[in-house]
C-alpha cells in the first residue's frame, strides 16, 4: 500500500514540474490575455490521460502515470481561477473563448487519446 502512495507522489511531482516548466516557457513567449499555458497543459493532459486509460499498461504504471503524473500535470483549479480572473476583468470575449475552447478541445483530445490507446 505504501508503495502505491510513493508511486503516485513521484508521478505527481514529475507532472507538476513539467507543468511549471511549460507554463514558464509559454508565458515568456506569448504575452496575451488568453491563458495559453493552462489551455495547452489541460488539452495535452486530456489526450495523454485518454491514451493511458485505454492502453494496456499494468496497474503500477496506471498509478504512476495516470493518477500521479497526469494528476500533477493537469490543473482544473488553475483553469477555474484564470476564468474568474477574466470575468473580474470583464474580458468576456476571452473568458467565453477560453471556457468553450477548453471544454470542446479537451473532449476531442480525450476522445482521440482513448481511440489511439486501444
Swiss-Prot record:
Record organism: Listeria monocytogenes serotype 4b (strain F2365)
Coiled coil: none
Summary of the function given for this chain in its UniProt record: Fluoride-specific ion channel. Important for reducing fluoride concentration in the cell, thus reducing its toxicity.
GO biological process, one term: cellular detoxification of fluoride
Subcellular locations according to the entry: Cell membrane
Gene Ontology molecular functions: fluoride channel activity; metal ion binding
Reaction(s) catalysed (UniProt annotation): fluoride(in) = fluoride(out)
Similarity comment text for this entry: Belongs to the fluoride channel Fluc/FEX (TC 1.A.43) family.
Residues that coordinate or bind Na(+): 71, 74
TM spans (from-to): 5-25, 34-54, 56-76, 98-118
Record's protein name: Fluoride-specific ion channel FluC 1
HAMAP family (UniProt xref): FluC
Domain of life: Bacteria
Gene (name only): fluC1
CC annotations in GO: plasma membrane
PANTHER family in UniProt: FLUORIDE EXPORT PROTEIN 1-RELATED (PTHR28259), FLUORIDE-SPECIFIC ION CHANNEL FLUC 2 (PTHR28259:SF16)
Activity regulation, per record: Na(+) is not transported, but it plays an essential structural role and its presence is essential for fluoride channel function.
Xref: Pfam families: CRCB
Signal peptide (from-to): none
Membrane topology note: Multi-pass membrane protein
Amino acid at each position: 500500500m505504501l508503495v502505491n502512495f510513493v508511486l503516485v507522489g513521484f508521478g505527481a511531482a514529475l507532472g507538476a514540474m513539467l507543468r511549471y516548466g511549460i507554463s514558464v516557457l509559454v508565458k515568456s513567449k506569448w504575452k496575451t490575455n488568453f491563458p495559453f499555458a493552462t489551455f495547452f497543459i489541460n488539452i495535452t493532459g486530456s489526450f495523454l490521460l485518454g491514451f493511458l486509460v485505454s492502453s494496456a499498461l499494468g496497474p503500477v504504471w496506471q498509478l504512476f502515470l495516470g493518477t500521479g503524473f497526469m494528476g500533477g500535470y493537469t490543473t482544473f483549479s488553475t483553469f477555474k481561477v484564470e476564468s474568474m480572473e477574466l470575468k473580474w476583468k470583464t474580458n468576456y470575449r476571452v473568458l467565453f473563448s477560453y471556457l468553450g475552447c477548453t471544454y470542446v478541445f479537451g473532449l476531442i483530445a480525450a476522445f482521440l487519446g482513448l481511440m489511439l490507446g486501444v
